Amino acid sequence: MDLNDLKIDPEFEEKIPPLTEDEFSLLEQNIVADGEVLDPLIVWNNTILDGHNRYRILKKHPEIPFRTYPKDFSDKYEAIAWICNNQLGRRNLTPEQRRYLIGKRYEAEKASHGGHYTEPDAETGQFTVSLSGEDLRLPERTSEKIAAETNTSRSFVENAERFAKGVDAAEAAVPGIRSG
């Protein structure tokens, strides 16, 4: 894939905590010293999901080789949920950044598939409920699913969504407030 084919969606990028100037500079030095980008840029429909900083470095150094790894999602909300979940794996998140990402993931997953989460039947792909009572599976709340995966509580996840909406509102009122 050509570098010029890739796009940055501001809605996706704003879910990713920014690097400090020192962190960005160190990343650039490492990429230039390695002579390649070691980690692939993760993309969905040529839009970058992970690798925004690497992409900016590549724009400054177009001679450096890179790879992409495509992901498949049914809509932008699934992509946003993936971005948030992927960022939650970072070790250097502040508690506020983690809370924001959990809130945005919850918001995106609700928008993608509604407020409940169930797995489709393995054979049919259909979402079904057995009336026999033996295999009755009630839909799991999206907040409960995320809470279990992030070692938090349902109320934490639901409060994190309100926190994230507040952060977004503050950012809309005073641009740049989120990054410091």
Predicted features, each with a name:
Residues 1-71, 78-92:
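Short, charged/polar connector segments at secondary-structure boundaries
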Residues 23, 27, 76-80, 98, ...:
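Alpha-helical structural motif
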Residues 91-180:
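Alpha-helical interaction elements
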